[in-house]
């Protein structure tokens, strides 16, 4: 026999149910959830497992917000397996013939020209490593499984005229990266971190803005306009005409050319 619940009792039960608080997320849980949504927006497994990336376009350098240099640029990035101290290597080729290069790895930083190969020094290497470890795309691609990596949700905001979700990302070495994620597309809009600069014995704020996301292959979306600021002054912009992922790089691309002359610092 089916029992009918009187209307008043039913309404009372429904009202009581609304008084039971829903289980709320912690700021860390919500922060990591947004990070996972960002990975999905960037291409999901296509993003997580991409092995190489090529960005081709124009690189601009600035001083006091004024353009001081413009060059065609090809930037090659490869990702290394787990266990490497830094799971990313990069070669930046500049010039009309792309014969000027900067090679950056976990252990060395070189400038290669027709004169030879010049070591860029320890500070340039440290800057590359710190910039990489703070980079939101590198964090999402290579660092998500680190046990002490935490995402703290800081609330909603408006950045670049876009609604965003603000996250603070912390690692076990007390690095902090703040990133602003678009509330609708879940693509990174802006990031900021601070690093110590021994040249001025003070901290510098490094800000990067990302726009013009386009398909790069295998379902991956990548920004075609990347702008960097240091202490509120624009210092660099890469405007890519084309970005591709999954290219097969020739062997030795991230090594010094055989027989190259090694110059003094």
Where are these regions (language model features)?
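N-terminal mature ectodomain segment of secretory-pathway/periplasmic proteins
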Residues: 36-117, 148-152
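N-terminal secretory signal peptides and thylakoid transit peptides that target proteins
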Residues: 1-17
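Flexible, processing/modification-adjacent segments and terminal tails
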Residues: 26-33, 106-175, 185, 195-202, ...
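Extracytoplasmic/lumenal soluble domains of exported proteins with redox or metal-associated functions
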Residues: 28-64, 88, 134-137, 157, ...
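Catalytic loop of the DD-peptidase/beta-lactamase superfamily, centered on the K-T-G motif
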Residues: 98-107, 117-118, 126-129, 229-262
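Boundary at the C-terminal end of the N-terminal hydrophobic targeting segment
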Residues: 22-24
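Short, surface-exposed linear segments at secondary-structure transitions and domain or protein termini
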Residues: 10, 82-87, 108-113, 130-132, ...
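Gly/Pro-enriched, hydrophobic low-complexity segments
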Residues: 160-256
């Amino acid at each position: 026999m089916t029992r009918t619940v009187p209307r008043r009792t039913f309404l009372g039960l429904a009202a009581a149910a609304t008084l039971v608080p829903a289980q709320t997320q912690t700021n860390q849980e919500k922060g990591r959830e947004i990070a996972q949504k960002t990975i999905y927006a960037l291409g999901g497994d296509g993003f997580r497992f991409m092995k190489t990336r090529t960005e081709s376009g124009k690189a601009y350098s600035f001083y006091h917000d004024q353009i001081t240099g413009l060059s065609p640029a090809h930037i090659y990035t490869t990702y290394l397996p787990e266990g490497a101290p830094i799971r990313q290597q990069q070669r930046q080729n500049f010039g009309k013939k792309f014969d000027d290069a900067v090679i950056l790895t976990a252990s060395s930083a070189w400038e290669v020209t027709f004169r030879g190969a010049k070591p860029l020094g320890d500070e340039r290497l440290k800057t590359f490593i710190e910039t990489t470890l703070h980079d939101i795309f590198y964090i999402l691609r290579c660092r998500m499984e680190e046990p002490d990596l935490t995402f703290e949700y800081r609330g909603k905001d408006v950045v670049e005229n876009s609604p965003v979700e603000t996250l603070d990302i912390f690692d076990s070495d007390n690095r902090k990266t703040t990133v602003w994620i678009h509330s609708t597309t879940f693509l990174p809009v802006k990031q900021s971190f601070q690093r110590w600069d021994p040249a001025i014995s003070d901290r510098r704020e490094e800000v990067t803005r990302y726009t013009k996301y386009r398909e790069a292959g295998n379902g991956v979306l990548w920004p075609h306009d990347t702008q960097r600021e240091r202490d509120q002054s624009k210092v660099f912009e890469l405007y890519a005409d084309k970005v591709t992922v999954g290219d097969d790089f020739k062997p030795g691309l991230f090594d010094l050319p055989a027989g190259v002359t090694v110059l003094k610092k």
